[in-house]
Amino acid sequence: SRDLKSGIEKATEKVVAYLEKTSTSVKGDMIDQIATISTNNDAKLGEIIGDAFRAVGETGVVMMEPSAEAETKVKIVDGIQYEKGITNQHFITNQVNKTAELENASVLLVESPIENIRQIQSILEHVIKNSIPLLIIADMEPAVAATLAMNKTKGNIKVNVINAPTFGINKREVLDDLAMLTGATVVNEDLGDDMDLIQPEFLGKCLKSITNEKDTIIQVEELSDQVLEAIEDIKIELSETQTPGNLIRLEKRLARLSAKIAIVQVGANSDIELKEKTDR
């Protein structure tokens, strides 16, 4: 009801105000100090990790990967942290980290449920013929997911499936933002798209995707003009809105579209040293 909605919004305002009043921001050298303690008092590594967090800001993501060189350094890329994780253990490619990883993959975004494998037959034929990995963000029938997992296990295709966003309006916004970032077109039966045979022209692309149990990191190429324009529009809308619920929604969109990913490339002189560093 309207009264319930109003009450929730007022409670949200009070909780946010209390948290802002009682919280302590981690800034400047404090980041280095925390990172140094977390890496067994390795000041140099702590400083590198601190630099990574400063580079991406509050909305960014910091992750790490092994480097082929002895030096540890930070690489900044554009990308997004999408809050959906592994859907099937057979999609895992990195058994050590328990992650599903794809490089230079095509991206398929589907808002309507995929009910049978024939609906994506043209997509599968396209990526298999051209040896392109495929990231699917969609809800689908278990039988479809099982068929894809089986073909991935047999080595017929490099594929990963993660669920579509969960809720109504937010679902469409998240998919639209993912579409802008990857260059894909969202397949939506409600808008007249033919779900009987989804075509390759709907596909976008990403440089890399890493899916763990909880979420997925999607690295993309340099942000397009469309994304940059959307970011500016959201900033204007943020400055004009007064509704707490709308503020939260817009802030999430802004973070999603403008976020950076810092990759700490961990260098070492041996496999033993590399394992010891990454374990920290």
Residue ranges of predicted features:
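Hydrophobic, well-structured modules enriched for small/aliphatic residues and gly/pro motifs
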Residues: S1-A11, V15
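Long, structured protein-protein interaction/assembly regions in large complexes
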Residues: E13-R280
